[in-house]
From Swiss-Prot:
Its cofactor is Mg(2+); Mn(2+). One of its GO terms (molecular function) is metal ion binding. This is DNA ligase. It holds the Pfam family DNA_ligase_aden. The gene is ligA. DNA ligase that catalyzes the formation of phosphodiester linkages between 5'-phosphoryl and 3'-hydroxyl groups in double-stranded DNA using NAD as a coenzyme and as the energy source for the reaction. It is essential for DNA replication and repair of damaged DNA.
Length: 669
């Protein structure tokens, strides 16, 4: 076959397969058999392999999966992916309607209602009609680049019907039938099954090997247009029609409503129809349809005023409470958990539910053997709602909390003003294990690859008993553990070694000193600069620091007034763990050449590691200016948790947005 003929046939096959994909995955109206589709796909793959010069990034053949990735790169969203406020009942919906009408002087308002797909929110970027990048929502400001995995989803067009540049947003999901099939295969292979379709979709999309995602039969509904060049959109319903014309899959079950009564009727209708869908939904999204009215209403600090998400009531089921087990946390708090006869709740099998503390058990009169009502709080955490007293037989047993720790047999105490029982033995194995999990966590020593499962294995193998023991681990020890190979063992040893270079505040937070969070740990580290100086500090010296109260100061002094802790710090020194502050102090920033010099910066949302007042001082010390509102003259918005209206303003004025992690990286350069 000549090159010219091969090129022509490749183009014919691509057009043909794109048409087949659109008919099957978007229109749900296949025109050919699976066998014919596969035959054409194999011919295309063969021709492209023989003629690599004709390979294209938007060829249907890329949907079978490409190169295995090492990591997912971070992506900063051009416009933040905001969350929505929630409504839980009819009253909440009417309150929303009243707020909307007050905000627009009771002008005529039309709502558009859509099913809230229970999947993974993603953004899709197209340049002149070609799919160039896809990303997860992440924290709303920064997500992960999952382009290669999204290319395997056949409902996502690789080339649009127009050469337009835009960003679309939607929900990737796994159909129920695909979920059942996947779990059946995993069970047959002796693998852990997914709890629900949402977890399956998220787990599939975040596979580093796109070939795995390609096998999972994922789909996607596009629900919004974040921005589009050279086109004016007047309403949300118009944007959905436009997206459909471009070749996207939009959900057909949307409806425009003229009154809140029509909205409520739509909600009730889909609450009934919900079980009959082939995909999971967890509510209804209601939006003001008119874009001009959306802009007039604006946003709050957390969410747009023109939209709300109605959450379906949590499913409640009845099951029998067969026992109560206890767990000990890293601070010694002993928490009771109900053991239940297995029951399906909101798509997952539930065997345990939180009982929180002894007072709750007494208040609800929960006894072993009771029939209880269980639901998932926020559709996530199982909890016991109440006891069905009319089902009691008299054989149920009252439960009494133990007087001694279930892990170490030390006497339990109830501290003043606390409802929880607590083990105060510093050598309690359960506390040590939970403390180790905290020590290696992201905001502490951030040791990649060392999660709860591995910590448990190391603990059970008696390889670690203290934080310092982590730094004596060898590759040979790791190779003795389940699921560890040469590469993973080498990587973990290196990750542990790298953590020695962390700045002091990470180590302080990782130690788990009571009342000391990430922000306080940074305050102490910057103030004292070394661990030795902090250890010697008195309660009065600690209380003299801004935002450090008496309770925290007493806790820090008590923590370091312990021979075991001092021995631990000595071991850290011997292993070469850094115990000095590596960040810059405000006094040191005056003569530093900085990104922030001459820049106007806006801080919004809650900053976890560094408070906004401290961040403001540092930016100003570096020659920057911090203002309270976003305008055309703003150079940067730093967005913490629950940032809202200022993000929308940043998008309007095309201002760059950083999350806290990116901000700290720049500060510490």
């Amino acid at each position: 076959m000549s090159k010219e003929i091969a090129k022509k046939r490749i183009e014919e096959l691509r057009d043909l397969l794109n048409t087949f994909n659109y008919q099957y995955h978007v229109l749900d109206n296949p025109s050919v058999s699976d066998a014919e589709y596969d035959r054409n796909m194999q011919e295309l793959i063969k021709l492209e392999a023989e003629n690599p010069e004709f390979m294209s990034e938007d060829s249907p053949s890329v949907r079978v999966g490409g190169t295995v990735l090492d990591i997912f790169e971070k992506v900063t969203h051009k416009s933040p992916m905001l969350s929505l406020g929630n409504a839980f009942n009819e009253g909440d919906l009417r309150d929303f309607d009243r707020r909307v009408r007050q905000g627009i002087d009771d002008a005529n308002v039309r709502y558009i209602c859509e099913l809230k797909i229970d999947g993974l929110a993603v953004s899709l970027h197209y340049e002149k009609g070609r799919f160039i990048q896809g990303a997860t929502r992440g924290d709303g400001v920064t997500g992960e680049d999952i382009t290669q995995n999204l290319k395997t989803i056949k409902a996502i067009p690789l080339r649009l019907n127009e050469e337009v540049t835009l960003e679309a947003r939607g929900e990737a999901y796994m159909p129920k039938r695909s979920f059942v099939k996947l779990n059946e295969e995993k069970e047959q292979n002796g693998e852990d099954v997914f709890a629900n379709p949402r977890n399956a979709a998220a787990g599939s999309i975040r596979q580093l090997d796109p070939k795995i995602a390609a096998k999972r039969n994922l789909s996607m509904f596009v629900y919004g247009l974040a921005n589009v060049e050279e086109k004016t959109i007047l309403s949300h319903s118009e944007s959905l029609d436009f997206l459909g014309e471009l070749g996207f899959k939009t959900n057909p079950n949307r409806r425009t409503c003229e009154t809140i009564e029509e909205v409520i009727a739509y909600v009730e209708e889909w609450q009934e129809k919900r079980p009959h869908l082939d995909y999971e939904i967890d509510g209804i999204v209601i939006k003001v349809d008119d874009v001009a009215l959306q802009e007039s209403l604006g946003t709050t600090a957390k969410s747009p005023r023109w939209a709300i998400a109605y959450k379906f009531p949590a499913e409640e089921v009845v099951t029998r409470l067969t026992g109560i087990e206890l767990s000990v946390g890293r601070t010694g708090v002993v928490t009771p958990t109900a053991e239940l006869e297995p029951v399906r709740v909101a798509g997952t099998i539930v065997r345990r539910a939180s009982l929180h503390n002894e007072d709750l058990i007494r208040e609800k009169d929960i006894r072993i053997g009771d029939y209880v009502v269980v639901k998932k709080a926020g559709d996530i955490i199982p909890e016991v709602v109440n006891v069905l007293f009319d089902k009691r037989t008299g054989e149920e047993e009252e439960y009494h909390m133990p007087t001694h720790c279930p892990a170490c047999e030390s006497e339990l105490v109830r501290l003043e003003e606390e409802v929880a029982l607590r083990c105060i033995n510093p050598t309690c194995p359960a506390q040590i294990r939970e403390g180790l999990i905290h020590f290696v966590s992201r905001n502490a020593m951030n040791i990649d690859g060392l999660g709860e499962r591995v910590i448990t294995q190391l603990f059970e193998a008696d390889y670690i008993r203290t934080f310092a023991d982590l730094y004596s681990l060898t590759k040979e020890q790791l190779l003795q553990l389940e699921r560890f190979g040469e590469k993973s063992a080498t990587n973990l040893v290196q990750a542990i070694e790298n953590s020695k270079e962390n700045s002091l505040e990470r180590l302080l937070f990782g130690l788990g000193i009571r009342h000391v969070g990430a922000k306080a740990a940074r305050t102490f580290a910057e103030h004292f600069e070394t661990m030795d100086a902090l250890v010697k500090a008195t309660e009065e010296e600690l209380k003299a620091i801004n935002e450090i109260g008496e309770k925290m100061a007493q806790s820090v002094v008590a923590y370091f007034d312990n021979e075991d802790v001092l021995e631990l710090l000595q071991q850290f020194k011997e292993y070469g763990v850094n115990m000095t502050y590596k960040g810059m102090k405000i006094a040191d920033l005056q003569n530093v050449e900085s990104y922030f010099a001459g820049k106007t910066v806006v801080l919004t949302g809650k900053l976890e590691v560094m408070g906004r007042s401290e961040a403001k001082k540092k930016i100003e010390a570096l020659g920057g200016k911090v203002t309270g509102s976003v305008s055309k003259s703003t150079d940067l918005v730093v967005a913490g948790e629950a940032a809202g209206s200022k993000l929308a303003q940043a998008e309007k004025h095309n201002v760059e947005v950083w999350n806290e992690e990116r901000f700290l990286q720049e500060l510490n350069k």
